């Protein structure tokens, strides 16, 4: 059953806070099932942060159900350039988010369900959570071949991944979250989670590729709505709580004091890109010159998302050495970003003489450099 998480009743449903807040009073005796009314990844991730940081989960676990508009979500210690096609994402308006848990990169859209299981650190148990999801799916489709693996994934028919998993363990609280593919755009997923960038050297956590499949490909009745209700029912049964899904607005400061500042932080360039572990790009590309090709070599070190070392080499007969030197100097300290690079190269472009051929080569070089960002 879905009920609105209104100001009238929310105060009596939620757990005690570790710190005082106007939005919460009284207690919940056992546990709670929440579902977000927002499809914004940053606000939904902020709910995870808020519950982890502020709620007393002792004897009162929480299940949080949420879905997002098209988004690629990377793990805390990952490199987005290594994990996904950022250029395609920009073209298609797909968001990029970095979560606070580890693990690999996943694609979210409205055909994917996200489940977050909150407990105390002592009660944290990923395998039990996944077994609960398996029971929920089998309750709807008894003959469904779905199993949890030692890697804490869920496999359909022994080979197709329908759920990936990640977690965060704090001093007292912990959460385990996982995806559940019901009707995700599989073609789009595959295109977005394929990095086109060459020559990246990084110690960042790398995702493990896997064959994926939607539950609806197996059984068209396994829609997101059906699966959400099944998981909620099984969770309520397992934890002996009321089978009510409480709808929440993750932007409501009266219920979640301070939550919007958490969402804003998760949207910043400094968090999404700046938290990328140090990496380098060592690559080259060719450009046409007088019916032949010349090679441009590029070596860039990136730290905290900013260019620390830049060495772009082009043959003297194609582009004067001093121009490459100016470009290298200008890029050092800037964001490893096509937007910032466009601004910097446009400023430099104005300083060169009105030579059409030189300007053409300059534009070609700059477009190639932006293409690796």
Curated annotation (Swiss-Prot):
Cell compartments where the protein resides: Mitochondrion
Keywords: Acyltransferase, Mitochondrion, Transferase, Transit peptide
Signal peptide: none
CC annotations in GO: cytoplasm; mitochondrion
pH and activity: Optimum pH is 7.9.
Residue positions binding (R)-lipoyl-5'-AMP: 107, 151, 161, 179, 208, 210
EC number in record: 2.3.1.200, 2.3.1.-
Similarity field: Belongs to the LplA family.
Role noted for this protein: Lipoyl amidotransferase that catalyzes the transfer of lipoyl moieties from lipoyl-protein H of the glycine cleavage system (lipoyl-GCSH) to E2 subunits of the pyruvate dehydrogenase complex (PDCE2). Unable to catalyze the transfer of octanoyl from octanoyl-GCSH to PDCE2. In vitro, it is also able to catalyze the transfer of the lipoyl group from lipoyl-AMP to the specific lysine residue of lipoyl domains of lipoate-dependent enzymes but this reaction may not be physiologically relevant.
Protein known as: Lipoyl amidotransferase LIPT1, mitochondrial
Species the sequence originates in: Bos taurus
Gene: LIPT1
């Amino acid at each position: 059953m879905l009920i609105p998480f209104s100001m009238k009743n929310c105060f009596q449903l939620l757990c005690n806070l570790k710190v005082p807040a106007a939005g919460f009073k009284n207690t919940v005796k056992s546990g709670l099932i929440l579902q977000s009314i927002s499809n914004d990844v940053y606000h939904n991730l902020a709910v995870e942060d808020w519950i982890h940081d502020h709620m007393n989960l002792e004897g009162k676990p929480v299940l949080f159900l949420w879905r997002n508009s098209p988004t690629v979500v990377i793990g805390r210690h990952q490199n987005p350039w290594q994990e996904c096609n950022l250029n395609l994402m920009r073209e298609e308006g797909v968001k990029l988010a970095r979560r606070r848990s580890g693990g690999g990169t996943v694609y979210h859209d409205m055909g994917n369900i996200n489940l977050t299981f909150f407990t105390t650190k002592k009660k944290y148990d990923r395998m039990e959570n996944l077994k609960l999801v398996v029971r929920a799916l089998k309750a709807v489709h008894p003959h469904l071949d779905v199993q949890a693996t030692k890697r804490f994934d869920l496999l359909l028919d022994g080979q197709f991944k329908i759920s990936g998993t990640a977690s965060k363990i704090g001093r007292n609280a912990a959460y385990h979250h996982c995806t559940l593919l019901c009707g995700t755009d599989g073609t789009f997923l595959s295109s977005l989670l394929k990095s086109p960038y060459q020559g990246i050297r990084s110690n960042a956590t790398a995702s493990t590729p896997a064959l994926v499949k939607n539950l609806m490909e197996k059984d068209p009745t396994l829609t997101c709505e059906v699966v959400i209700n099944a998981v909620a029912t099984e969770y309520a049964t397992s934890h002996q709580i009321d089978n009510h899904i409480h709808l929440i607005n993750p932007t409501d400061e009266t219920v979640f004091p301070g939550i919007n500042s958490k969402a804003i932080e998760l949207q910043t360039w400094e968090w999404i890109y700046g938290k990328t572990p140090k990496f380098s790009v060592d690559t080259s590309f060719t450009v046409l010159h007088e019916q032949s090709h010349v090679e441009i070599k590029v070596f860039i070190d990136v730290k905290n998302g900013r260019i620390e070392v830049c060495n772009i080499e082009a043959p003297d007969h194609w582009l004067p050495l001093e121009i490459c030197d100016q470009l290298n100097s200008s890029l050092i300290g800037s964001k490893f970003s096509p937007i910032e690079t466009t601004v910097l190269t446009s400023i430099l472009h104005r300083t060169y003489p009105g030579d059409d051929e030189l300007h053409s080569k300059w534009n070609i070089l700059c477009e190639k450099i932006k293409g690796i960002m």
